[in-house]
């Protein structure tokens, strides 16, 4: 049997010209839920994290989130697919990643951020949304494979990041 102990909203907000996820609010909701479990005398054996794909956050060298992640619903990727296809064909990208082209995919968000010159100079790590939660819970920087597969930056055959895609698009491989 399952019992819902806590529920909280997750709504993007407009900040600095972009729709952003409020990570602090999300983590507060998570913390409240975990406290309710603990206060209820339940034994916690493990915790699973399940979120949507494609969105990411950038962390600095001290492993702190630089700014709230931009939501996949933001319009910053308008026209980016066509720009990327001038650098790497849709067929070649599919051959490498096995993922369909959608403007909300992480690859297009990263190119849009770079093209808009909004890449923070202090960015040292990139974490997908569930990995931000993992980092909050345990302090580790981990890129979980199934979430990485939503980025259109991972090889479908090796299950590793595809450095040739990063190089072709001028994206910083070292933050992965």
Segments predicted by a language model, with ranges:
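Gly/Ser/Thr-rich active-site cleft segment
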Residues: 93-176
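Short alpha-helix plus adjacent loop in nuclease-associated cores
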Residues: 70, 74-89
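Short hydrophobic/aromatic-rich motifs at helix boundaries and adjacent loops
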Residues: 4-7, 50-54, 80-86, 104-106, ...
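Short beta-strand-loop/turn "lid" adjacent to the catalytic site in phosphate-handling enzymes
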Residues: 15, 39-73, 97-104, 130, ...
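N-terminal glycine/serine-rich phosphate-binding loop of ATP-dependent small-molecule kinases
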Residues: 1-68, 79, 95, 122-124, ...
């Amino acid at each position: 049997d399952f019992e819902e102990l806590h529920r909280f909203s997750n709504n993007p907000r407009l900040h600095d010209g972009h729709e952003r996820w409020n990570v602090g609010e999300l983590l507060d909701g998570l913390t409240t839920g975990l406290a309710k479990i603990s206060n209820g005398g339940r034994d916690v054996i493990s915790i699973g994290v399940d979120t949507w794909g494609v969105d990411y956050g950038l962390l600095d060298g001290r492993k702190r989130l630089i700014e709230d992640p931009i939501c996949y619903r933001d319009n910053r990727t308008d026209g980016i697919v066509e720009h990327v296809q001038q650098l790497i064909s849709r067929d070649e990208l599919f051959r490498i990643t096995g993922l369909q082209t959608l403007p909300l995919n992480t690859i297009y968000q990263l190119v849009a951020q770079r093209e808009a010159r909004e890449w923070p100079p202090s960015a040292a790590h990139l974490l997908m949304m569930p990995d931000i939660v993992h980092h909050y819970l345990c302090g580790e920087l981990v890129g979980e494979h199934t979430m990485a597969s939503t980025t259109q930056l991972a090889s479908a055959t090796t299950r590793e990041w595809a450095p040739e895609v990063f190089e072709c698009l001028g994206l910083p491989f070292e933050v992965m």
